[in-house]
Amino acid sequence: MASLSFASSHASLFCCQQSSSAIILRPAGALLRLSRRQPSSHTISTTDQLFPRRSRMPRNVDTHAAAERNSPSTMSSLEAVDELETNGDSAVVVVREQQQQQHLLMGATDDGLPPSPYDTAWVAMVPAPGNPLVPRFPQCVDWILQNQRSDGSWGPDGGSGDHPSSPLGKDALMSTLACVLALKTWDAGEEHVRKGLSFVGNNSPSCVMTGDERDAPVGFSVIFPGMLARAIDMGLDIPMMTQANVDAFIRLRDTELNRMAATTGSKAFMSYVAEGLGDVLDWDEAAMVYQRQNGSFFNSPATTAAAAIHGNNDRALRYLDSLVNMFGSSVPTVYPRSTYSRLHMVDTLQKMGLSRSFVSEINEMLDMTYRSWLANDDEEMMLDMSTCAMAFRLLRMHGYDVSSDGLAQFSSESSFRDSVHGQANDTEALLELYKASQIQITEDELVLVDIRSWSAKLLKEQLGSDKVSRSVDAQEVQQVLKFPFYTTLDRLEHRRHIEQFKAGGFHMLKSAYRFCKEDEELVSLAVQGFHSSQALYQQELQFLTRWAKEARLHDLEFARIMPMNTFFPNAALMYAPELSEARILCTKNCMLATAVDDLFDVGGSREEMENLVRLIDMWDEHEEVGFCSERVEILFRAIYDTSKELAAKAMAVQNRSVINHVAELWADLVRAMMTEAEWSMRGHVPSSMEEYMQVAETSFALGPIVLMPLYLIGPELPEAVVRCPEYKQLFHHMNVCGRLLNDLQSYEREAKQGKINSVLLVAPRHGGSIEAAKSEVRRAIEASRRELLRMLVAEADATVPRPFRQEFWNMCKMVHLFYMEDDCYSSPKELVHAANMVVFDPLRVREL
């Protein structure tokens, strides 16, 4: 019966290739005093089967709060690692201070929204009260005059209007025509109008035939033809524009309107793009349904300005007044957006591995969001799918008590199809809803079940038809669908997001906008932190390799002693520099637990098994027992010495001795393995799942791998907490997930070996059906995973502090990833590649 273990491999040279589209970034040597070299170019390769008999993993942790390292090193061989760790963390602090001086979090406010020429033009067209011959906002007219490009276009920052097939080409066309209409409305900027019309005329005819519809502003097919008709009515002569061209645009609009008329969500979308419809829309009716408390229509300045022009809407005017007062002479394409901006920033910091450096800022942002969630007073959050789903996910995962009822309005597929998001084929909204739906903590959260079902279906449809929105990377959609959040290793996720980070990546509404202020700062900070961590990991791996050799573990010919494969998952989840000692101990215990498992499973005689059990039972009095073989002596002394080392280090953190608990965990493990060995020798089959799991949970070996390192991560872990029911339940549900996931993967092999397995044990109650038995086992896994997640995020009345609960959840994530039934990490090549990406391979980051 398998326990959790990693197989490792030996190093060989690897040459990193530089592609034309990527730059290989290496760590700055100045960050590290002891290691000024770049991350090693050595990679891990193997001719061995990484999981020769069983797949199991060492424990891993992601502690969001900075865990204190109070224990001094007690081994001289670790001093260099300790110093490297301190210097690496100091570098992060220095960089963080520099970024704070540059207001890195400015992008998380509405002040960080860039100007939208398109929306500014519509605001500029609003007439003054009582005098329709002058503009209400002359400063917006001035801004238009001052911000025309040399080619005659207007458009979002970073865009190019040279050709309509460029990513922001249609945006430039729509923005330019809107600015021309605004200037013509007030007979201003004759030369600007001429140049703008020239740009539109030279580029718009090919617009119908070229470019990807995903690059078009939302509503382009309705709004641009509508503005074109208005320009003609105003007597504007557009160069190169023939009647055939005009007819083509009218057909484009008619086709879009006919498409919308066939859907139940057409009213919302037609109101959103109403500036392209003019007097055709019933503005009073639209105001009754879609005007928000702040006076806006959909938080869109352009739509709201059109309502003020066509409907004499006082609330719309007050919204526009406040908007111009806030932003000055230009306006953004959406306002307010502060809630989304804050949540987007928190999410980005987490995905890039930077959240530890901004704990107080993140807490402040989430506290603000939670207050709004409870008060239900934030229209931006409650009405916008992306914002609402992201708020739910981040709040729940950070321990805030939020109900899935907040997403009930999005429970059906029609809620998406009938919305502006659905009409715009908004991938981001779908993706956020899908990610939120995975954070299910009770079986009866059917809202999340329903959302997960239809959002996954639509995301797959978008991938299959190549309709993923430009604001979302298609690879991100594929990754999220393939790997649920409970199967991810944090450092691999950080690397992926850093490398795929879209500097200048834009969100497309009626005009493109982006959170531009944080791009370079975020990537720079993330790259430096990742590379300094890699240098530390390499030092730790070198130490562990030396330790295994000095402990003579390689003399155990039956054992899988593979430092790299046992270390890398710990680095991937327990990635923080200050957790160095916990990473090292966890890796040691995983190697030792693997060796113990191999002794009981394939390598040891009955005498050796019983001898090891007796030695661990006697512990400090082991000399009275003696060693029946050199192999048992090597293994016991490694366990004993490592445990004493842990106890000495833990004393400085816990202010008490933990050696009795440590010895107890090892004793429980070998007794359980001895029981399984006796079952196998006697051909005994447990009479029930309860009898089987009572032994099998313990024999999976997560006690030494997970529980012991908890003493090193801080804060204090009192004896009363270790013995409390909550702690035992956390351990139980983690063990259930690990053991049963392993059983699903190994039942065929163990059936041939005559060993018992939960799948084989359950099958008889289903008439011998293996598939039915597997379904029952999967349901048990799902129930334990759900309960473990509930215990992680439930802060009320929690006895076990969050950093320790996080450890149990991280191990649950690890076993889910490595025991996925589609064998995503079952091949040596894939596992080696993942290990290299965490420990050795430098980042390949897109140029900013």
Curated annotation (Swiss-Prot):
**What EC number(s) does the entry state?**
4.2.3.196
Q: Which residues form the signal peptide?
A: none
Q: Which cofactor does it need?
A: Mg(2+)
* Residue numbers covered by motif DDXXD motif: 597-601
Which keywords, in A-to-Z order, does the entry hold?
A: Chloroplast, Lyase, Magnesium, Metal-binding, Plant defense, Plastid, Transit peptide
Name its cellular compartments.
Answer: Plastid, Chloroplast
| Reaction catalysis annotation | ent-copalyl diphosphate = dolabradiene + diphosphate
Q: How is the cofactor bound?
A: Binds 3 Mg(2+) ions per subunit.
List residues binding Mg(2+) 1.
597, 601
**What is a single molecular function from GO for this protein?**
lyase activity
GO CC: one term? chloroplast
Which family, according to the similarity comment? Belongs to the terpene synthase family.
Q: What does this protein do?
A: Involved in the production of antifungal dolabralexin phytoalexins in response to biotic and abiotic stresses. In response to fungal infection and in associtation with AN2, is involved in the production dolabradiene, a type of antifungal phytoalexin. Converts ent-copalyl disphosphate (ent-CPP) to dolabradiene.
* Designated name of the protein: Dolabradiene synthase KSL4, chloroplastic
